[in-house]
């Protein structure tokens, strides 16, 4: 069974409006809870790097396990 994560980004549009963008990512299953926590932490770091790389103006973002 795979691990599914829900990513929500509150993006700030050029006119000042805040729009929520959602995405689901499915990653391979882990054998332990510690592995799942590590996978979640790595995903949060990857999302942060992607937002900085693409210079997306955002108010906040959340990553949760579905």
Positions of predicted regions on the chain:
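Short linear motifs centered on Gly/Pro in flexible linkers and helix caps
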Residues: 6, 33, 37, 41-44
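Assembly/interface hotspot detector across virion components, adhesins/toxins, and nucleic-acid enzymes
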Residues: 8-12, 25-27, 58, 63
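Residue-level detector of functional hotspots within protein domains
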Residues: 13, 29, 47-49
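Short linear/disordered segments characteristic of secreted peptide precursors
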Residues: 14-16, 28, 54
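Short, mixed-charge low-complexity intrinsically disordered segments
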Residues: 41, 45-66
């Amino acid at each position: 069974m795979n691990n599914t994560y829900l990513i929500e980004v509150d993006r700030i549009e050029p006119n000042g409006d805040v729009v929520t963008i959602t995405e689901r990512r499915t990653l391979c299953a882990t054998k332990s809870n510690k592995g799942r926590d590590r996978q979640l932490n790595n995903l949060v770091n990857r999302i942060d790097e992607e937002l900085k790389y693409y210079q997306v103006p955002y108010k906040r973002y959340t990553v949760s396990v579905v």
